[in-house]
């Protein structure tokens, strides 16, 4: 998907350069929060990855609850859990990531991708805001 097609399909918009979390990414990403942290029981954000951009392996820790849900809005990307094959991520797909599972996600080499992400809460607090 080229940039023009991607911009039309990305209904929530690209957002701003994700400078606060750049250290956790290979390539450039953009963040558009859709809910305000701390004022909503679930943090929802549109994270846009440029082609070849991905985040580092990471874990969303939680003793109870927690986890992450990714919903592919536009473009194509990859999702991988440690010890498993990478999964192609396309518009309309939903990936549920349990707490304490090491994983990464990002764009394919020739496509932008935007997985809208939801961070589930732990005891009424947002416990993870990594993109």
Walk through the language-model features, giving the residues of each:
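Ligand-binding loop in jelly-roll beta-barrel domains
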Residues: 38, 85-86, 90-91, 99-126
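Short, charged/polar surface micro-motifs in flexible loops or helix N-caps
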Residues: 39-40, 49-54, 74-77, 123-124
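Residue-level recognition of conserved beta-strand positions in structured domain cores
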Residues: 46, 59, 73, 81-83, ...
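A short beta-strand-loop-beta hairpin characteristic of the jelly-roll/cupin
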Residues: 54, 64-91, 101
